[in-house]
Amino acid sequence: MNMEFLRKLPTPQEIKTLYPLNSELAKVKEKNDEEIRKVFTGESDKFILVIGPCSADREDAVIDYIKRLRIVQDQVADQIIIIPRIYTNKPRTTGAGYKGMLHQPNPLSDPDMLKGLVAIRKLHMRALEEAGFSCADEMLYPENHRYLSDLLSYVAVGARSVEDQQHRLTASGLDIPVGMKNPTSGDLSVMMNSINAAQHSHTFIYRGWEVDSKGNDTAHAILRGYVDKRGQSHPNYHYEDLIQVHELYEKSGLLNPAVIVDTNHSNSNKKWLEQIRIAKEVLHSIKSSEKVYKMVKGLMIESYIEDGSQKADECVYGKSITDPCLGWEKTEQLIFDIAEIRRNKC
């Protein structure tokens, strides 16, 4: 094989033993999970915001940001459930660039996966302990989910991973909502097939074990836009797109039809300021149709402390080193605006 085996990494159980979750925090996560699940099963009409930095690059800034979210959450709790994004591993279009805290706990240092495993667990634990949030992360590597399985309340499977069998089967064994993004091509049948696979039980190999999964009835769709064969971005958040997904759900027989709309990526053509307009357009679409209202459960928004993005070596506190994000002032106002629109029945 054309690779060097550097060292054996600790198992998830070994990492959890070194950095255990106490019973009080476990109860907080359980309560969060219950509230979030009720949205996806239709028992609650609260609106979900999966919101936070494109990538969690440094612990201090991410925790600062999440504490700010906590203050806002308490003011909009009648309408909104905030699930902070703590994305600790990042897919890269060409394979080059910062791959997230799991790979590089210090973005300016060489990769160190052992330090990365510890860093991402500590970060998610701090979010729960200091702000009461059990957060969202992307399942880039299915075999790594168990390092954080007692801390996460939401998982996303990305556009480049959604066709992969191991991602689908692992999602079928999780007991939290898993969002399946449409692939970069925009083929909605791929996304629906992925949800179908995740909602059913399977026998497969996971971390060296033969396992049986029970199926995940809260696996659902994330619409993130798409790229055509010429490399041009196209949105899929408009009213007619939502109606099309609703029709696909009706034909599929899938449980708990649900959509989260990603306001960035190809939906915004990575024009981060467009996220504000897109969020409000989705809310308008919800107002226009009862079936869209029932299906669209929330939004995914990329947001941090400072507007825009930077190179990793610029070291501006709270500014994204991957995709550009909304800054805090715009984020806070957008959340308040969304809550007010919801209070007025959209």
Residue ranges and their predicted role:
Residues 1-41:
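N- or domain-start disorder-to-order transition segments that initiate the globular core
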Residues 48-61, 323:
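Conserved phosphate/anionic-ligand binding catalytic regions in large, soluble enzymes, centered on
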Residues 40-43, 70-77, 125-130, 213, ...:
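Acidic (Asp/Glu)-rich catalytic clusters
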Residues 304-344:
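Internal helix-turn-beta structural module
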Residues 52, 261, 327:
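Conserved, mostly hydrophobic/aromatic
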Residues 66, 79-244, 265-266, 270, ...:
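Active-site-facing alpha/beta catalytic cores
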Residues 54-57, 256, 264-270:
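Short acidic, Gly/Ser-rich segments with clustered Asp/Glu that frequently serve as metal-coordination loops
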Residues 25-42, 72-83, 89, 120:
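N-terminal beta-rich core of secreted/periplasmic extracellular enzymes
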